[in-house]
């Protein structure tokens, strides 16, 4: 009732005058541009959601393996990407085998929990071919409130993402570097998340009003 037509449940990246749908597509394009998959290359998407990124990558001619733990999402993405070079499976990220030119994972790691951050980055490092790139979009917690946040359960952890945790970037970055991954690019767009949330709220309120 509140998502845009792409069914993307993560922050968009807005330019002046963008609709939510246009901003979500802008974000997807930015992710695909950053990983820069070669022609006829391959992409692993960890946590494919409802398939917007997998569809966009498939339309670029990229061979996509998309994984999810939700059977409803799998069915939806299979239908959405029919005719494209996209394979969708019910697979835990720790069970992925094979190597890919790139990995994309958009706001999935928050649901993993701190205990499994190391497993998550190990899975990404293992899946990348030499010279491959990963794009990871995550919601971070400010360094100065990390200790207090970590020691307590807030509303989001209790009711939205049980067991999840926002990312402490220095710790997460160290785990990634321990697996041989190097940090090539960083783009922070917190104000875009605020606008995304506003648009979701407006969509939700309209859906309620429309019955």
Residue ranges with predicted function:
Residues 94-103:
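A short acidic, Gly/Pro-enriched loop at the edge of an enzyme's catalytic core
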Residues 1-34:
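Conserved Class I S-adenosyl-L-methionine-dependent methyltransferase catalytic core
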Residues 140-211:
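Substrate-binding/catalytic lobe of Class I Rossmann-like enzymes that use SAM or dcSAM, i.e.
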Residues 50-61:
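Conserved SAM-binding loop of SAM-dependent methyltransferases across substrates and taxa
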Residues 82-93:
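Conserved SAM-binding strand-loop segment of SAM-dependent methyltransferases
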């Amino acid at each position: 009732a509140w998502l845009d037509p792409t069914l993307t449940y993560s922050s968009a990246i807005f330019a002046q005058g963008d609709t939510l749908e246009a901003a979500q597509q802008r974000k997807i394009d930015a992710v695909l541009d950053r990983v820069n998959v070669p022609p006829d290359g391959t992409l692993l998407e960890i946590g494919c959601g409802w398939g917007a990124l997998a569809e966009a990558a498939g339309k670029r001619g990229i061979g996509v393996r998309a994984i999810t733990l939700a059977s409803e999402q799998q069915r939806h993405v299979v239908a959405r990407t029919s005719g494209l070079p996209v394979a969708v499976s019910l697979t835990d990220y720790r069970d992925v085998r094979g190597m890919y030119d790139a990995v994309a994972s958009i706001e999935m790691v928050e649901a993993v929990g701190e205990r499994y951050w190391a497993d998550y980055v190990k899975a990404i490092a293992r899946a990348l071919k030499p010279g491959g790139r990963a794009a990871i979009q995550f919601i971070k917690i400010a360094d100065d409130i990390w200790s207090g946040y970590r020691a307590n359960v807030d509303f989001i952890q209790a009711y939205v993402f049980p067991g999840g945790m926002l990312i402490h970037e220095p710790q997460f970055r160290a785990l990634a570097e321990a697996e041989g991954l190097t940090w090539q690019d960083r783009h922070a767009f917190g104000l875009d998340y605020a606008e995304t949330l506003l648009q979701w709220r407006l969509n939700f309120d309209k859906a309620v009003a429309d019955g």
